[in-house]
Amino acid sequence: MDSTNLDSELFIEFKSRGKRCQLFYISDSHSEGLYEIVSIERERLAMWLPWVEDMKSIENERAFIKYAREKMERNELFMLTICVNQKPVGMIDIHNIDLQKHQAEIGYWISEKYENQGFVKQGLKKLIKIIPSKFKIDKLLIYIDVDNVKSKFIPISLGFKKEIEISQFEFYNGSYHDFEIYGLNVNERNIANGKSEIFTNKEQSEYFNFPHCLSSCKS
């Protein structure tokens, strides 16, 4: 993997529980690392993520990344690769950006090896503080399968509130799944504090001067 290329697309860097984590703008250079996780952890990820079934080759991953970057260039999506020591371990994103309703949805996933280490929570915490001003977003939503207990911890720990439960919201793995929707009014947010040290010292405006300032997890 070309670490020089990754460095050129760094969004933010922070520390969580003593480990250094980077969020990079999604790039083709991440495709092999991301697909390796999907390939190894396919059964686990497919329990909650319908797109895993369609991710059958490295070519599929590269095609998705190309699609994502095109949407980001149109400010329809904002997707980041979670890296630990520049190794891809997962993704977070803001998708379904609705400028009329001033709201958007958040998606995320991470390798089992890196769960429960604060990378997703701290990454989203940084993202939530920055992104709303760019997209004029007032409301963020997270949709979660009612049985995905680990995933529910993320919005709750960040101050999101459960707004509604929808029966038979999605069909995958041969059955219907009920979902819970968690919401956060970003102008009134009270994001829970977490131990995290930011290394990248830039003003918000600098974050969006990246030449391909792209605006999902695969949703």
Model-derived features with residue positions:
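Conserved GNAT-fold acetyl-CoA-binding loop/helix
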Residues: 46-66
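Acyl-donor (CoA/ACP) binding surface of acyl/acetyltransferases
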Residues: 1-33, 37-44, 79-219
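A short hydrophobic/aromatic micro-motif that marks alpha-helical segments and, especially, helix-coil
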Residues: 56-57, 72, 190
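Residue-level detector of secondary-structure transition/capping positions
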Residues: 39-42, 53, 69
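Short loop/turn motifs at secondary-structure junctions and domain boundaries
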Residues: 70-75, 160
